[in-house]
Amino acid sequence: MKDKFSFQKNYDFNLVSDGLYEIWNNAGFFKPKDKNNSFTAILPPPNLTGTLHIGHAFEVSITDQIMRFKKMQGFSINWIPGFDHAGIATQTKYEKIALKENQKYFDADDDKKSEMIMNWALNQSEIIKNQLKSLGVCLNWSETKFTLSEQANKIVNNCFKNLYENGFIYQAYTLVNWDTKLNTAISNIEVINKPVNQHLHYVVYKLANDSKQELIVATTRPETIFADVCLLVNPKDKRYTNFWNKLVVNPLTGKQIPVVTDSYVDIKFGTGILKCTPAHDFNDYEINTKYKFDFLSCIDSNGILNQNASKFQGLSVLQARNKIVKWLEKNKLLVKSIPLTSNVGFSERSGTVVEPMLSKQWFVDLPKLKDHLYLKKYPDFIPKRFNKQVSNWLNKLKPWCISRQLIWGHKIPVWFENNTGEIVVGEKPSKNLQNYTRSKDVLDTWFSSSLWPLICLNWEQDDSFHETELLVTGYDILFFWVLRMLFNSFFETKKLPFKTVLIHGLVRDEQNRKMSKSLNNGIDPVDLIRNYGADAVRLFLCSNHTPGDDLIFSEQKIKSAWNFLNKLWNVTKFVIQLENDQEISYDLDKLSLSETWILAKLDKVIQKITKLLDKFQLALANQILVKFVWDDFCNTFIEAIKKEPNQLKPQLFYTAKSVLSNIAILLSITVPFLSERIYQQFNNKSVMQATWPLATKIKIPKLFDLVLAAINDLRNYRKQYMLNSQQKLVVILSGKNAVDVKQYFNFSWIELKIETNKKVSFKYQIVDDTTQRLKSLQKQQAFFESEVKRSQAIVKNKSFLEKAPKEKVKSEFLKLEEYQKKLTETNQLIAKLTKAH
């Protein structure tokens, strides 16, 4: 697959990547070849609510690195892509668009609305697909899945039915997170807690049989007083011992409610008395499971106070709160109101305050399901510290609310008989369908997502389920998605859905802040690819993270990645120029010192990074490879080639292209586009057809390391004594190998002399003109003394310190510090030379 590509121009990532992805895809490189040696992974399906964000780019880049590595190791890879219909997120997104562009949507029936959303969603999936392709990921597009497809629906309905029939799905009237704007139950992950400035109101509850005695209760939600069922005090709080089991009067309804003792109450908060409103607070709801008081509700599904709120009925929560506070104050039932900042839950989708609301919903009994499954083995979580976190979550499981009052999603497969209330689950009734009404609710999008492995592997067609080898995902959805996948997949198949879960962190901005719309600090990977190319973006993402930890975004590091690729491009151009038509007999025993050294170094790198990749230490493997390419190959070997005799050039080209081809293979898992172009220059096939190189255990020649150390010492000497380009160092090489290595010392600033000395292998000596060196240093000394005096005069000038910009003042102090440092170093060198002289 020799590609006619020119390396003659400057590095242009657009030209480099142009057309390559289509070639790979059309050639079938992303499709599995052998079912018996497979390595399968599933793509966490991106939501169809927008374009890819930097977190997606991070996740798919590191997964692609693993998949390409496994392919080169001989595995038949199958990385299955797909998209999540994303329920509430997609519906609200489309409805915002429809407000501006499609008013007909709001007059349509539910089926027509779903059709409109579906058309928009499918268009979004094409946009996201093209963005993924621009990153060069080796996804098997022929197996693309969708969580709201007919195929997915069969699996979803079947799982719902099986869970229901086995007693793990039930319907209950209980407290849920309620979005009063969208009129639906929502999940915990869709509730965003934000600090809100509000007031803590101290309200009077008078004793029922003695109005002169009273209890003061602090609350931020006086509008829920209508639904109070009791007051709670801590039994350790001696202030209220006389009020135990007494009755107090609800200040808004006049009804009597008891005072109950419970150790849950925080003595230090407010007055140490808690009003219990189980229909409007999750903690109160849990407390009431012990006391079994009747539930009272005073807020309806639209966030409006209902008939239980007396004259405040019909007001919104905030309107009612303000008026109730004024009424309490007027009737001398309000002691005080003090400012307080506390967290309030907001709906991620509508932005409205979330109300705890009593509602009839469908639930999966996760605690019961966990006990039933009795999983003795779990996937390997990497890093291992997440095993403990998973274990903690498993011990704190609660029933999962899976019903939503939306249009977009899998309709809950439940039909109710209109007269008897009989329930048919899974498939529509086979007889008298007209006598049944189907549930209007849809399933939580996480329910269908929890069956993603089964959807990806076509479980409805073939129930011989095979677990996937790998899942790469973020820690932020470990509970909401991964554990639920584990439960539902194992329930259906009796097998784990994946062997290994590699966990990554979030991508944070350069100030280490979580990216969010409110901070306007999101990074668009498409813009980065447009500016730096996919290879540079991928190299940054794959080289600067630790498993399980957050990645700090740095555009400067992306620029550094681009600089590395530009360096590699130019070195490739140089190697290409070495090529000629002369045939050679390539003999490993007759290689030059530099050739043996670079091949041995390459061998060591192959060993190291293969071990690291096997352990999913991806970034560390990249860092080692980049260092080898930059320092050993480009800066050392390529520079050494330039000093080798011309008669060795044909052989040197062969060695250089061999090393460069191996670099292309090693680098291709992270930098696919440029690696492909480099590999094709020297091989008649794609890098995706290459096999991962094996280490051959070549020994690094010690002599060349000695040469490199000597050259490094000479450079440091010049720097230390501040020698300019005109001042040459006289260097004597001696030893039996001196003649063999002299070409490596061929620098314009070295005057080389060779002496015969067969007693040693190799040594060098600097013939130093101490007098000349002292003169040079004394000249530098005078300059630095002058600059120190000048700078000291400036920073002692009061006028300068008062009037000059802060940055200017800071800069001058830094200059002074630097000049003082250099003067000290120069003085030390002069003293050293004077003593030696």
Swiss-Prot record:
Domain of life: Bacteria
GO BP annotations listed: valyl-tRNA aminoacylation
UniProt keywords, alphabetically: Aminoacyl-tRNA synthetase, ATP-binding, Coiled coil, Cytoplasm, Ligase, Nucleotide-binding, Protein biosynthesis
Major location (coarse): cytoplasm
Positions in coiled-coil regions: 767-837
Matches recorded under InterPro entries: aa-tRNA-synth_I_CS, aa-tRNA-synth_Ia, Anticodon_Ia_Val, M/V/L/I-tRNA-synth_anticd-bd, Rossmann-like_a/b/a_fold, tRNA-bd_arm, tRNAsynth_Ia_anticodon-bd, Val-tRNA_synth_C_sf
EC number per UniProt: 6.1.1.9
Ranges spanned by the short sequence motif 'KMSKS' region, renumbered to the chain: 514-518
Enzyme class: ligase
Compartment(s) where it occurs, according to its Swiss-Prot or TrEMBL record: Cytoplasm
Entry binding sites for ATP: K517
Gene Ontology MF annotations: aminoacyl-tRNA deacylase activity; ATP binding; valine-tRNA ligase activity
Similarity-based family: Belongs to the class-I aminoacyl-tRNA synthetase family. ValS type 1 subfamily.
Subunit text: Monomer.
Name of protein: Valine--tRNA ligase
Organism: Mycoplasma genitalium (strain ATCC 33530 / DSM 19775 / NCTC 10195 / G37) (Mycoplasmoides genitalium)
Lineage, uppermost ranks: Bacteria, Bacillati, Mycoplasmatota, Mycoplasmoidales, Mycoplasmoidaceae
Gene this chain is encoded by: valS
